[in-house]
Amino acid sequence: SGEWQVMIAGESYKVLVAEAAKSAMAALGDKGQILERVMITHLLKDEKEPDRVAGAVGFSVREDKYYVFKSKVTIALMGGAVHVFRPRSQGEAFGRSWMPPFVAGSVYALVLEAGGELTQMDNTFVPPRFKDSYGPVGTFFLLFKTPVMNSVGGSYVGAYPEQLSKWAPYSNAKPCPTPMRNYEMILCAKEGKIPFMMHTEMVVERFKQEISDPKELKKKIKMYESEAWEDFLDMTIAGATNWAAHNIDPMEKPMELQMSDSVFIGSHACSCGSWCCGPEDLMPAQYKDAFPAQYNCMTTVKGLFTAGCGVGACAHKFSSGSHVQGRIVGKSVVKFANDNKAFTPTISDATVAKYKEMIFKPFATFETHKNFTTTPDVNPNYISPHNFLFRLQKIMGEYAGGWETLYGTSDKLLEAGIWKLSLLGEDIEKLAAKDLHELMRAWECVHRYYVGEACARTRLARKESRWPGYYYKYDYLKLDDTQKNFINVKFDVKTKEWSILTRPMIPII
């Protein structure tokens, strides 16, 4: 393997991937088709092989169209999930978060509803980023070695050796793992030593001490300034506008850091996602019984594959690793399709009609009851997508370890939260939508709901605090290696029952 933490031009990936898709379309000719602006709401199970995925249904978010897809093999690639927990940005900036607002947890919810296992759903990521804009800190941390200090001018990193000793040997690793650094920020915040400031202006002072040649110094400062602004304008334009709004020149003033809201991203510094089959030559034999067949990146549901954020227990893929995993899953699905040439998806007209009625039900609910009140936003007969989302986020934030409690929770809090989630789940039937955009929001809410409950139930099942900087349990505030296992969750759509499975953590390296 090569070096880690190498700077990349990640914003250019989309162009490269789009070129590959364009080339594939050219090769396929009339057989190729790309459909955009389609919201996939459900996966379809084959009616002759009920444990096999045979397609999907959804609707256009721009036109009055209902889509039914039949397939020999299906790949779910919808990113992770944000806004399951309440974002810190409210009101004018509502929804501003570190992850794109359009990742609604569909990759997790669809696998779950299809009968698949999810793993590590308690392991959310909490990125420490620039306050309110969530701009990237990597360039400053890694490239320019920019110092970060608490409000009394001290460093929080390494300031709490006694508390972190509970998580040895992980807390002693170099570099310090992200959950440990985050936990140090939490401990520092509990002492009131906030805000945290990244002293970008100190980098300029360091350059002045290190470089005596005026021309070289000017060149170095110019490079620093252009790298900083370019990084934000490429990735997080709001970061640059936030500086301007606060009259901050990063060459002259420090910038505030803050831990963000919790997000689900199985390809970054956490490992939530689907329990997936590994390569035949590396996957331990104890895991094989979970899968209907041996194909790399296939979920526990036959014919359903995923990659990137969809694959659980496989953290730190980032951009390049997700790209590689995409290539791996592409080869796997081709092999699966070739091995199953005789298979023809069986989906009845009755099933197609049932899902159509289900998907568009929020329209009917709205039209039936909209005149009951003087304003359509508040109505005793239905709930709007926004109000459903607010309720979900409030429950998750206050009971399941959001920023509202400084990422802390407990069994009693989680039990109360799961009870409230069950009440919220009853209101899925009462979601209403006045247009296609709200219909999309309604189904995003449903997907986020399933992700939230999977998270809460997994956190309740785990009797330790394995990632204290992402979330910790007041009643199990330590690392317990007798609990060193994968906690998986399943959902039965027919009985509406959840089940927890524990699988051993078997090192393969």
State what each model feature region is:
Residues 1-52, 122-315, 398-509:
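Mobile, glycine/GP-rich and aromatic-enriched active-site lid/loop segments adjacent to catalytic centers
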Residues 24-32, 62-65, 112-119, 281-283, ...:
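Secondary-structure transition/capping motifs at alpha-helix termini
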Residues 55-60:
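Short beta-strand segments that buttress and anchor functional surface loops
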Residues 63-73:
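Core beta-strand elements of the Rossmann-like FAD/NAD(P) dinucleotide-binding domain
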Residues 73-136, 315, 319-332:
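Glycine-rich loop(s) and the adjacent beta-strand/alpha-helix scaffold that form part
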Residues 116-123, 336-349, 469-471:
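Acidic/polar loop patches that form or flank catalytic/metal-binding clefts of enzymes
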Residues 295, 299-362:
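Catalytic phosphate/nucleotide-handling subdomain of diverse soluble enzymes
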Residues 339-434:
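Long, amphipathic alpha-helical stalk/connector segments used for oligomerization, subunit docking
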